[in-house]
Amino acid sequence: MAKLTVKDVELKGKKVLVRVDFNVPIKDGVITNDNRITAALPTIKYILEQGGRAVLFSHLGRVKEEADKAGKSLAPVAKALSEKLGQDVVFPGTTRGAELEAAINELKDGEILLVENTRFEDIDGKKESKNDPELGKYWASLGDGIFVNDAFGTAHRAHASNVGISANVDKAVAGFLLENEIAYIQEAVEAPERPFVAILGGSKVSDKIGVIENLLSKADKVIIGGGMAYTFLKAQGYEIGTSLVEDDKLDLAKELLEKAAGKLILPLDHKVANAFAGYTEVKETADQNIPAGFMGLDVASKTIADYNTQLEGAKTVVWNGPVGVFENTDFQAGTVGLMEAIVKQPGVKSIIGGGDSAAAAINLGYADKFSWISTGGGASMELLEGKVLPGLAALTEK
């Protein structure tokens, strides 16, 4: 990576500003999934071990007005982080002001402080989300000229807490998580070991047009599953029953199929039901057609067998988006079959691009079998599309 990293700067005795992604699910004050906190630990521990004084910034959820602040404080995160690190995490509970400044100035080497939810600054004019120059300058002034961005999940956004701070410090560098995310995803797309197979699921073609086009030029095969497969199948003249479809994208789907020249792999059969919720009948189709009154909610046995064929010998696999409604046990066999087909390939570099695919791998017990699971759905999508991430572009060149 052509950007400075946390290992390139002297940290001892410095107040080091760190953007992390602690946007974790919290229910009744309890964190229900702490993966993002765990993912940030290597960078945080390194800064503390080097004698840095870590000042952490993160958002949590969306905050547009005062009422939205309920349940959005980072207080439970400070507590969880303290337990994981085995040391106190100072939490003044504010995003600016004399109390915060005093607490930061009192930090000693190897100590850590967490600033309150950066999106609390969005209540009065979206200062965080719109990268208010004064806010970025103020937050930058709280440190000693070093900013570490380790929040890949927000790297595709230009906010005051990443791009804004970067513009007002001497050195803006990447943390270990950000460095790894870029290394795995960018390298997989730009310099893959071949055969390179990309798998795209999810519901809408419109969400992934740029990704499909970029990957068609880079991958040896692009497997399409999930809801967006039905738009491609309808474009080819197949019956899709009451399945999800984007009729306004049929011409685009035809164009992509022509451009793909056989690289796009679609389902061969489906697991269907007579309703999305409250269904009374579930069955497998004999082929690519779906009968009237039924909707496709997963791929079926022929497609799962085809996944094994298509993935045989693959050396690089990038997967973004489930191929069925995996949250429902009736419709998770396709996603499980796909994961099985990926992880059994010898020597494969297997990468999951965050979001629902990551949730599927974690919930279904496959997480530790993949080479890398991204922490950022939107950011990984933009990398797969070949876009420049603002949070990364703002870092200091080597």
UniProtKB/Swiss-Prot annotation:
Annotated membrane-spanning segments are: none
Annotated residues for binding of ATP: K208, G296, E327, G354, G355, D356, S357
Q: Which UniProt keywords apply?
A: ATP-binding, Cytoplasm, Glycolysis, Kinase, Nucleotide-binding, Transferase
Question: What InterPro entries does the entry give?
Answer: Phosphoglycerate_kinase, Phosphoglycerate_kinase_CS, Phosphoglycerate_kinase_N, Phosphoglycerate_kinase_sf
Provide the binding site for substrate.
D21, F22, N23, R36, H59, L60, G61, R62, R119, R157
Q: Which reaction does it catalyse?
A: (2R)-3-phosphoglycerate + ATP = (2R)-3-phospho-glyceroyl phosphate + ADP
According to its record, what are the GO cellular component terms?
A: cell surface; cytosol
One matching Pfam family, short form? PGK
Q: Where in the cell is it found?
A: Cytoplasm
- GO MF term list: ADP binding; ATP binding; mannan binding; phosphoglycerate kinase activity
Q: Which domain of life is it from?
A: Bacteria
Q: Which pathway is this protein engaged in? A: Carbohydrate degradation; glycolysis; pyruvate from D-glyceraldehyde 3-phosphate: step 2/5
Q: What is its main location?
A: cytoplasm
Q: Which Gene3D superfamilies does this one have?
A: Phosphoglycerate kinase, N-terminal domain
Q: Extract the PROSITE patterns matched here.
A: PGLYCERATE_KINASE
The enzyme's E.C. designation:
2.7.2.3
Q: Which GO terms describe its biological process?
A: gluconeogenesis; glycolytic process
Q: How does it assemble?
A: Monomer.
Family, according to the entry, reads as follows: Belongs to the phosphoglycerate kinase family.
State the name under which the record lists this protein. Answer: Phosphoglycerate kinase
- List the source organism: Lactococcus lactis subsp. lactis (strain IL1403) (Streptococcus lactis)
Gene encoding the protein: pgk
